[in-house]
């Protein structure tokens, strides 16, 4: 057998063992020339138990009260950040005196849609005066005298 045939045989054995969980465990054990186990190989029960013991020892235990305090602080910071960002949106958007979250978001959406419409009409040459779209939600019509 040449190297290609050996490789193909080992490759098919690996694929078969991965697709068939009841396959012979010897098929899952493929050793290289030095006798070192490869990644796809099953570990012995003893080494698995040792691994579990090591993992249990390295895990740290967090008290539930510490975790709840941490969660409470995170939620409070999140609410404050949302409140600040809503205030910023309210300041940026003209004619938005409401303090309700839904009303602020409605004003911002309406203002953004009006700006998008003004940009579209300006790019199409339909309307050259962008000042027609300055108010949030209301198009100002004026007579140039």
Curated annotation (Swiss-Prot):
It is found in: Nucleus. PROSITE patterns: BHLH. GO terms for biological process: embryo development ending in seed dormancy. The keyword Lipoprotein does not apply. Residues 33-61 are annotated as: Disordered. InterPro entries: bHLH_dom (IPR011598), HLH_DNA-bd_sf (IPR036638). Keywords: Developmental protein, DNA-binding, Nucleus, Transcription, Transcription regulation. Its main location: nucleus. Residues 33-49 have a biased composition (Basic and acidic residues). Residues 66-115 form the bHLH domain. GO terms for molecular function: DNA binding; DNA-binding transcription factor activity; protein dimerization activity. Required during early embryo development, for the endosperm formation. Homodimer. This is Transcription factor MEE8. It comes from Arabidopsis thaliana (Mouse-ear cress).
């Amino acid at each position: 057998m040449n190297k290609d045939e050996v490789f193909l045989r080992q490759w098919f054995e690996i694929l078969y063992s991965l697709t068939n969980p009841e396959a012979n465990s010897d098929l899952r054990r493929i050793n290289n020339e030095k006798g070192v186990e490869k990644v796809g190989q099953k570990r012995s029960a003893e080494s698995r138990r040792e691994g579990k013991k090591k993992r249990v020892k390295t895990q740290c235990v967090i008290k539930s009260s510490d975790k709840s305090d941490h969660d409470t602080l995170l939620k409070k910071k999140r609410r404050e950040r949302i409140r600040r960002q809503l205030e910023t949106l309210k300041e940026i958007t003209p004619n938005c005196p409401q303090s309700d979250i839904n009303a602020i978001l409605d004003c911002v959406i309406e203002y953004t849609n009006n700006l998008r419409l003004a940009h579209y009409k300006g790019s199409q040459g339909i309307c050259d005066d962008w000042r027609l779209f300055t108010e949030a939600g209301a198009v100002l019509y004026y007579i140039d005298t």
